[in-house]
């Protein structure tokens, strides 16, 4: 095997945008990784998920086609018979 071809595997501190920090090991130089989200603040792990409306597409759809009620389809089908 060739010597000195593998990067060093060192202790690294991961810092999240929420302020949470934890230690891990990585080959990234500098010993510090900055992350936007972690398991302490990510909506999937915290259970505080939100539906993101990208660019108002849901509102645009509702304006165009109207907001249907749950029983409206059944009432319409019964009226057609």
Curated annotation (Swiss-Prot):
Cofactor note: Binds 1 zinc ion per subunit.
Protein name as annotated: Large ribosomal subunit protein bL31
Keyword Lipid metabolism attributed: no
GO biological process, one term: translation
Coiled coil: none
Keyword list, A-Z: Metal-binding, Ribonucleoprotein, Ribosomal protein, RNA-binding, rRNA-binding, Zinc
Family: Belongs to the bacterial ribosomal protein bL31 family. Type A subfamily.
Organism listed in the record: Mycobacterium marinum (strain ATCC BAA-535 / M)
Cofactor(s) demanded: Zn(2+)
Residues binding Zn(2+), per UniProt: 16, 18, 38, 41
One Pfam family matching this protein: Ribosomal_L31
Function: Binds the 23S rRNA.
């Amino acid at each position: 095997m060739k010597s000195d071809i593998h990067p060093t595997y060192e202790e690294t501190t991961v810092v999240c945008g929420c302020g949470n920090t934890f230690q891990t090991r990585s080959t990234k130089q500098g010993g510090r990784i900055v992350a936007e989200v972690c398991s302490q603040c990510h909506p999937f792990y915290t259970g505080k998920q939100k539906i993101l409306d990208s660019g108002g597409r849901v509102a645009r759809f509702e304006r165009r086609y109207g907001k249907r009620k749950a029983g409206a389809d059944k009432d319409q089908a019964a009226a057609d018979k």
